[in-house]
Amino acid sequence: MNDFITETWLRANHTLSEGSEIHLPADARLTPSARELLESRRLRIKFLDPQGRLFVDDDEQQPQPVHGLTSSDTHPQACCELCRQPVVKKPDTLTHLTADKMVAKSDPRLGFRAALDSAIALTVWLQIELAEPWQPWLFDIRSRLGNIMRADAIDEPLAAQSIVGLNEDELHRLSHQPLRYLDHDHLVPEASHGRDAALLNLLRTKVRETETLAAQVFITRSFEVLRPDILQALNRLSSTVYVMMILSVAKHPLTVAQIQQRLGEKP
C-alpha cells in the first residue's frame, strides 16, 4: 500500500476503540487527520511488513523493528529467577517470564499466561467462525487480551480500554441488568440458543478460567491484590462475552448505539 491512509479509511476498517492496538502495512503513510485520530484514541500503532515483522515509528518517524508483544527493540540478558545468574544456554525446563527473567515451567504464573494464550486463540478462532456483526466485539476482545498479556509480561499498569465504545462500568451494568438494557433476561446456556451462543459461551468460560488462574497468582494468602487492573479487566471481559450471548438470543438485538442510548437514560 503506497497510498495515504485517511481518517475515513481508518474508521471503515478498524473499530478504533480507545487503548487498542492496530497493525498497518509497513509502507503505509498517514494523513495528518488520520494520525491525529489515532493519537486522540491512544491507539498503539504497529506496521507489518510482508515477512511478518513488526515496526514502530521513532520520534523521527523512522521505522524500528520491535518485539510483537512487548514493542521492545532490545534483547536484555535473561537471568534465572532462583539463582540470579545469567542463563547462557536455556534448558527445556526454563522459559521467559519477562525479557530479563527466566523461571521454571512449573511456575503458576506460566499457567495463568497459558490460559490467557488459549483465550486469545479461541477469540481468533471465533473471528473466523462468527458473522460480521460480532467482528468489532471480537476485535476489541482480542486486543484487550493482548494488552493484558503485554502488561503482565513487561510488568506495567494496564491502561483503560473500551469494547465497541463501551467502558468497563457500562459493560458491568449491562451484564447485571440485561432485561433493562438489552430486552432479554439472564440466561443459562442450552442447545436451543443456537450456534453463536454456544461458541460465545466457550469463550466466556475460557475467560472465566483465566480470571480464576490470575486470582491464584495475583491474590496473596493475606488477600493482598497484586494486579487489580488485570483481575478487573478479565472480569469485565467475561461480562462482555455474556452480553454478546444475550444479544445473540434476543428476538430483536439492539445495536451498540441503541445500547449506549439506554445506558444514558435516567432510571
From Swiss-Prot:
One of its GO terms (molecular function) is metal ion binding. It catalyses: 2 cob(II)alamin + reduced [electron-transfer flavoprotein] + 2 ATP + 2 H2O = 2 adenosylcob(III)alamin + oxidized [electron-transfer flavoprotein] + 2 phosphate + 2 diphosphate + 3 H(+); 2 cob(II)inamide + reduced [electron-transfer flavoprotein] + 2 ATP + 2 H2O = 2 adenosylcob(III)inamide + oxidized [electron-transfer flavoprotein] + 2 phosphate + 2 diphosphate + 3 H(+). SUPFAM superfamilies: Cobalamin adenosyltransferase-like. Induction: Part of the 17-gene eut operon transcribed from a single promoter, induced by ethanolamine and adenosylcobalamin (AdoCbl, vitamin B12). It holds the Pfam family Cob_adeno_trans. Pathway: Amine and polyamine degradation; ethanolamine degradation. Binds 1 divalent metal cation ion per homodimer with both subunits providing Cys ligands; Fe(2+) gives most activity and is possibly the physiological cofactor, followed by Zn(2+) and Co(2+). Activity stimulated by Mn(2+). Gene3D superfamilies: Cobalamin adenosyltransferase-like. Signal peptide: none annotated. The keyword Cell membrane does not apply. Disruption phenotype: A quadruple eutP-eutQ-eutT-eutD deletion is not impaired for aerobic growth on ethanolamine (EA) supplemented with cobalamin (vitamin B12). Can grow on EA as sole carbon source when AdoB12 is supplied; double cobA-eutT mutants do not grow with CN-B12 as a nitrogen source. A non-polar deletion mutant grows on EA from pH 5.5 to pH 8.0, but does not grow at pH 8.5, no change in acetaldehyde release on EA plus vitamin B12. Its EC number is 2.5.1.154. It is found in: Bacterial microcompartment. One of its GO terms (cellular component) is bacterial microcompartment. The keyword Metal-binding applies. Homodimer. Belongs to the Cob(I)alamin adenosyltransferase family. EutT subfamily. Converts cyanocobalamin (CN-B12) to adenosylcobalamin (AdoCbl), the inducer of the eut operon. Is not active on cobinamide nor other intermediates in the adenosylcobalamin synthetic pathway. Allows full induction of the eut operon. Can use ADP, CTP and dATP in place of ATP, and cobinamide in place of cobalamin, none are as efficiently used as ATP and cobalamin. Expression of the eut operon allows this bacteria to use ethanolamine (EA) as a carbon, nitrogen and energy source. It relies on cobalamin (vitamin B12) both as a cofactor for the ethanolamine ammonia-lyase (EAL) activity and to induce the operon. EA enhances bacterial survival in macrophages in a concentration-dependent manner, suggesting it is an important nutrient during infection. This is Corrinoid adenosyltransferase EutT. The gene is eutT.
